[in-house]
Amino acid sequence: MSLNPRDAVIVDFGRTPMGRSKGGMHRNTRAETMSAHLISKVLERNAKIDPAEVEDVIWGCVNQTLEQGWNIARMASLMTQIPHTSAGQTVSRLCGSSMSALHTAVQAIQTGNGDVFVVGGVEHMGHVGMMHGVDPNPHLSLYAAKASGMMGLTAEMLGKMHGISREAQDAFGERSHRLAHKATVEGKFKDEIIPMQGYDENGFLKVFDYDETIRPETTLESLATLKPAFNPKGGTVTAGTSSQITDGASCMIVMSAQRAQDLGIQPMAVVRAMAVAGVDPAIMGYGPVPSTQKALKRAGLTMADIDFVELNEAFAAQALPVLKDLKLLDKMEEKVNLHGGAIALGHPFGCSGARISGTLLNVMKQNGGTLGVSTMCVGLGQGITTVFERV
């Protein structure tokens, strides 16, 4: 395929192993240290790229305080081989932060405002809890449902509206762990996981090159025993069908097609379209439907044209209505989250957008796909989507 000089292409992707937030592998590693290690290793394996060419490090992070404060993009960049002459900015679109980081870089490239960008994101949810320092305006309840800030209750609402049964949610949760374990055993994650030192459950330092969050022993029977996590009386959403609270980072190198060609670099994919959309915060998990419809329209495509999809699994009760309305339920086994998702791998907020996008590109490469969509819901009622074409 032919590319325009100002097309934005992805030339590499890497991520940390996903660690449990409670006593997990990253418990003694700071968020900016994790980010810097990842950025450094991804740049090291792309020797044709001079770090001095990096225009901007654009890093997603939601709770920007404590070790994640004071512009963690710049903090991490200063700890890498990227020179001080390159810039850094931290962005937040809650769950969609690192996908927004990608979109920001793509827009800069398309408009001639840079040729080489490092994008991604991090969230150390073990060190900086999701609600640490958060003080929502009490007047917000005059404009949106009071429970809109309680993600589990929005999932309960969406699941109830779409008639999603507890059994269907449990089956989706079991699938996530089963497929993630299968991908691990078959080495499907080896190109994306950047090994990192961490501590095992006994406190011994070791190198991790796998996700410690996956539970291969998960069964429908074990999931059926779990109690509702958010609505004790009549709820259907459990811890086993919710994204895990984890620690991790993800990183992409994004370039103009012209600069990649000049350096003799074969891109993984080109970004064909992007979109964001808003929905009622009470059903925040529905956001991927309008954002994906908008992105596909901009690309001149329909969902039937798409080979593979990565949908962030915030909750099974949220993912299943999205798949239903995107006409993907009957195609799920052949198209959607073939290596599992956030129920098994976790959802470190600032990390996930680039993580699912990079995993998508590897799924496309491993299975011969040409067109792919990565999409996710965003807290308080948004969706964000990227359409990729493999080159």
Curated annotation (Swiss-Prot):
The active site is at residues 95, 347, 377. CDD domains: thiolase. Pathway: Lipid metabolism; fatty acid beta-oxidation. GO terms for molecular function: acetyl-CoA C-acyltransferase activity. One of its GO terms (cellular component) is cytoplasm. Transmembrane segments: none annotated. The keyword Transferase applies. Belongs to the thiolase-like superfamily. Thiolase family. This is 3-ketoacyl-CoA thiolase. It comes from Ectopseudomonas mendocina (strain ymp).
